[in-house]
């Protein structure tokens, strides 16, 4: 077994205090997202989306956040993907934003709700054309005999859609994750990290400090 126990560092970029927290967690999330973007972090919108299968086995993957507001967090995916199939059976999911250079993490528990075709199309039309074509090509999570199969399909579809707009695939969609709880983690000195969790109680957010 490889021993990694000596890899550590102190966290000293700042603290998080109850008096500084807004009542709405999405306001704090918006601030932290802005600061992550201003710091020019690589992929600040990247989040880990966790789902479970029918046996309770968890699965995780990195997905890009595309929109957020007071209602929740939006991402898009192939509806035939493993994540979409698992959401169809159990829409309870978790999201995790790892902003390591800022010594911050945000963890979200919530329920995924399918977006309307109108909402999906609105976003789909903003994607670069090659990305739109790629959505037609990949049967996400299916097995491939070789990469050349995928590339061949891509160039075939690229020729097919050379003129005009690329239509929205019926098997491509998106989700709004409505949060039930949001935890904010700020690294602290001597491993005394600051953790605050917002928990939704009907229409009110309850704020609690958690031990690190």
From Swiss-Prot:
<dbReference type="InterPro" id="IPR011576">
    <property type="entry name" value="Pyridox_Oxase_N"/>
</dbReference>
<comment type="subunit">
    <text>Homodimer.</text>
</comment>
<dbReference type="InterPro" id="IPR019576">
    <property type="entry name" value="Pyridoxamine_oxidase_dimer_C"/>
</dbReference>
<feature type="binding site">
    <location>
        <begin position="76"/>
        <end position="77"/>
    </location>
    <ligand>
        <name>FMN</name>
    </ligand>
</feature>
<feature type="binding site">
    <location>
        <position position="127"/>
    </location>
    <ligand>
        <name>substrate</name>
    </ligand>
</feature>
<feature type="binding site">
    <location>
        <begin position="61"/>
        <end position="66"/>
    </location>
    <ligand>
        <name>FMN</name>
    </ligand>
</feature>
<dbReference type="InterPro" id="IPR012349">
    <property type="entry name" value="Split_barrel_FMN-bd"/>
</dbReference>
<dbReference type="Pfam" id="PF10590">
    <property type="entry name" value="PNP_phzG_C"/>
</dbReference>
<feature type="binding site">
    <location>
        <position position="123"/>
    </location>
    <ligand>
        <name>substrate</name>
    </ligand>
</feature>
<feature type="binding site">
    <location>
        <position position="66"/>
    </location>
    <ligand>
        <name>substrate</name>
    </ligand>
</feature>
<feature type="binding site">
    <location>
        <position position="83"/>
    </location>
    <ligand>
        <name>FMN</name>
    </ligand>
</feature>
<dbReference type="GO" id="GO:0008615">
    <property type="term" value="P:pyridoxine biosynthetic process"/>
</dbReference>
<dbReference type="InterPro" id="IPR019740">
    <property type="entry name" value="Pyridox_Oxase_CS"/>
</dbReference>
<comment type="similarity">
    <text>Belongs to the pyridoxamine 5'-phosphate oxidase family.</text>
</comment>
<feature type="binding site">
    <location>
        <begin position="8"/>
        <end position="11"/>
    </location>
    <ligand>
        <name>substrate</name>
    </ligand>
</feature>
<keyword id="KW-0288">FMN</keyword>
<keyword id="KW-0664">Pyridoxine biosynthesis</keyword>
<dbReference type="Pfam" id="PF01243">
    <property type="entry name" value="PNPOx_N"/>
</dbReference>
<feature type="binding site">
    <location>
        <position position="185"/>
    </location>
    <ligand>
        <name>FMN</name>
    </ligand>
</feature>
<feature type="binding site">
    <location>
        <begin position="140"/>
        <end position="141"/>
    </location>
    <ligand>
        <name>FMN</name>
    </ligand>
</feature>
<keyword id="KW-0560">Oxidoreductase</keyword>
<dbReference type="GO" id="GO:0004733">
    <property type="term" value="F:pyridoxamine phosphate oxidase activity"/>
</dbReference>
<comment type="pathway">
    <text>Cofactor metabolism; pyridoxal 5'-phosphate salvage; pyridoxal 5'-phosphate from pyridoxine 5'-phosphate: step 1/1.</text>
</comment>
<comment type="function">
    <text>Catalyzes the oxidation of either pyridoxine 5'-phosphate (PNP) or pyridoxamine 5'-phosphate (PMP) into pyridoxal 5'-phosphate (PLP).</text>
</comment>
<protein>
    <recommendedName>
        <fullName>Pyridoxine/pyridoxamine 5'-phosphate oxidase</fullName>
        <ecNumber>1.4.3.5</ecNumber>
    </recommendedName>
</protein>
<feature type="binding site">
    <location>
        <position position="131"/>
    </location>
    <ligand>
        <name>substrate</name>
    </ligand>
</feature>
<comment type="pathway">
    <text>Cofactor metabolism; pyridoxal 5'-phosphate salvage; pyridoxal 5'-phosphate from pyridoxamine 5'-phosphate: step 1/1.</text>
</comment>
<feature type="binding site">
    <location>
        <position position="82"/>
    </location>
    <ligand>
        <name>FMN</name>
    </ligand>
</feature>
<feature type="binding site">
    <location>
        <position position="105"/>
    </location>
    <ligand>
        <name>FMN</name>
    </ligand>
</feature>
<feature type="binding site">
    <location>
        <position position="195"/>
    </location>
    <ligand>
        <name>FMN</name>
    </ligand>
</feature>
<dbReference type="GO" id="GO:0010181">
    <property type="term" value="F:FMN binding"/>
</dbReference>
<keyword id="KW-0285">Flavoprotein</keyword>
<feature type="binding site">
    <location>
        <begin position="191"/>
        <end position="193"/>
    </location>
    <ligand>
        <name>substrate</name>
    </ligand>
</feature>
<dbReference type="InterPro" id="IPR000659">
    <property type="entry name" value="Pyridox_Oxase"/>
</dbReference>
């Amino acid at each position: 077994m490889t021993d990694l126990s000596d890899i550590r560092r102190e966290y000293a970029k700042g603290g998080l205090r109850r008096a500084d927290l807004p009542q709405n967690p999405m306001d704090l999330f918006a601030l932290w997202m802005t600061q992550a973007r201003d710091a020019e972090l690589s992929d600040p919108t990247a989040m880990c989306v966790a789902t479970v299968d029918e046996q309770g086995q968890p699965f995780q993957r990195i997905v890009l956040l595309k929109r957020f507001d007071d209602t929740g967090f939006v991402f898009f995916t192939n509806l035939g993907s493993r994540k979409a199939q698992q959401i169809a059976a159990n829409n309870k999911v978790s999201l995790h934003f790892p902003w390591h250079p800022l010594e911050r993490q945000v963890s979200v528990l919530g329920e995924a709700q399918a977006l309307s075709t109108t909402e999906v199309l609105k976003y789909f039309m903003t994607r670069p054309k090659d990305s739109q074509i790629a959505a037609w090509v990949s049967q996400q999570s299916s097995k491939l005999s070789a990469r050349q199969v995928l590339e061949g399909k891509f160039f075939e579809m690229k020729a097919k859609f050379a003129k005009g707009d690329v239509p929205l695939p019926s098997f491509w969609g998106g989700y709004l994750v409505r949060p039930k709880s949001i935890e904010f983690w700020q690294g602290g000195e001597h491993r005394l990290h600051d953790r605050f969790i917002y928990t939704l109680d009907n229409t009110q957010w309850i704020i609690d400090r958690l031990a690190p």
